[in-house]
Curated annotation (Swiss-Prot):
Subunit structure and binding partners: Homotridecamer. Interacts with the stopper protein gp7. Interacts with the portal protein; this interaction occurs at the end of the packaging when the terminase complex is replaced by the connector.
Location relative to the cell: Virion
Species per Swiss-Prot/TrEMBL record: Enterobacteria phage HK97
Encoding gene (name): 6
Pfam families, sorted: Phage_connect_1
Name of the molecule in the record: Head completion protein gp6
Keyword Magnesium assigned: no
Keywords: Viral genome ejection through host cell envelope, Viral long flexible tail ejection system, Viral penetration into host cytoplasm, Virion, Virus entry into host cell
Lineage start: Viruses, Duplodnaviria, Heunggongvirae, Uroviricota, Caudoviricetes
């Protein structure tokens, strides 16, 4: 079951991140927020995160950074070269699953 981004980070916090106060773009903001969240979840590759409460604060912060990049540069073409968000990757690095699988339950 996929985790809904708005269960992890509120819509109002996403709007604060991009300094947007109106309600006319809520659907678009939610779409980009979910895409940023999914990107960060795939990057970390931690199958132990099953519910919103499992997501560490650093990963939530990274989601906000990636979301802001996606929202600001939402056109397919850009006059400037875009790069991976190094700050977001540093925030997620310690939470990345390098084992390739979930930790087994103790006593199992």
């Amino acid at each position: 079951m996929a985790i809904d981004v708005l269960d992890v980070i509120s819509l109002s916090l996403f709007k604060q991140q991009i300094e947007f106060e109106e309600d006319d773009r809520d659907e678009l903001i939610t779409l980009y927020a979910q895409a940023a969240f999914d990107y960060c979840m795939r990057w970390c590759d931690e199958p132990a995160w099953k519910v919103a409460a499992d997501i560490p604060a650093a990963v939530k912060g990274a989601v906000l950074l990636v979301f802001a990049d996606m929202f600001e540069h939402r056109t397919a073409q850009s006059e400037v070269q875009l790069y991976e968000n190094a700050a977001a990757e540093r925030m997620m690095f310690i939470h990345r699953n390098w084992r390739g699988k979930a930790e087994s339950e103790e006593g199992s």
